[in-house]
Amino acid sequence: MKIARFTEGGTTRLGLVVAAGAATDTGEIIDVGSADPSLPTDVGVLLASGDLTRLGRTAGTAARLALSAVKLEAPIAQPPTFLAIGLNYADHVAESGMTKPAAPVVFNKQITCVIGPGDGVEIPTAAPDWVDYEGELGVVIGTRCRNVSVADAPSVVAGYMIVNDVSVRDWQRATPTMTMGKSWDTHGPTGPWLVTADEIADPHDLGIRTWVDGELRQDASTKQMITNCWELIAHLSTAFTLLPGTIIATGTPAGVGFAMDPPGCMKAGSTVRIEIDQLGVLENPVIAQP
């Protein structure tokens, strides 16, 4: 299933996306949220309830809406935790002038940074010069879990989506920890929907591409990860409990703006488009902070 959170007619609800391909302006959405008003209006809340089958009970009779007629929202508006991994592609390690880490580099993005498709990524007034994009595969946890083995890790995954780990590079590098450079409001675009795990045969063989204003900047595969999704889940859950709806952004490949010569960071007026095979497209305009 492709589970979307969307707004139409002044209300936000859940739906099932069909026949969309990679685009978010073609295809339809089955309006299960209207057909069953008892459904949660957030994918994270639905996952916490432990019953995804509720979505299918009214799918056969629910109305269908054109995707172009609705506003897609972040699938999980307030994840319990938004974790991210740094330096998880060797080519990005190299372009950053760093050495391969001995263990996964883990940091938090504050959940207030989450936005959805089409929402504006703000260039902060206080830090306008080094605002960068990072196209990433997002893994979403579906089951409360702790001490998960690598072998069992697939069983705790609800699905996948696209994440743009927007980064304010000068703030990121000002301190040993990255949270302040990674958590500005609007700097966590996610979407365009959650693709359930059963639809992705291998999350470690997906093409990932990022464009800025039509220029291809990142073109890689998730097979290039240093620490794969299952290993990351095992590592993280050794230390702390993972809750349903937790987002894990698994790192970005080479091609980020700060590493270009001259630098190619985002500016107000830019558009960033990220596409991951089988997951769709996440596109956001870049705007000045109001």
Where does each model-flagged region fall?
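N-terminal accessory regions of nucleic-acid-interacting proteins
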Residues: 146-160
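N-terminal non-catalytic cap/leader segment that marks the start of a structured domain
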Residues: 1-104, 273
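A structural-propensity feature for long, helix-poor, extended segments
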Residues: 116-138
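Residues embedded in well-ordered beta-strands
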Residues: 14, 136-140, 161, 209
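Short helix-loop capping/hinge motifs at secondary-structure junctions, enriched
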Residues: 145-148, 199-201
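Structural signature of FAD isoalloxazine-binding scaffolds in flavoprotein oxidoreductases
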Residues: 100-117, 131-133, 267-278
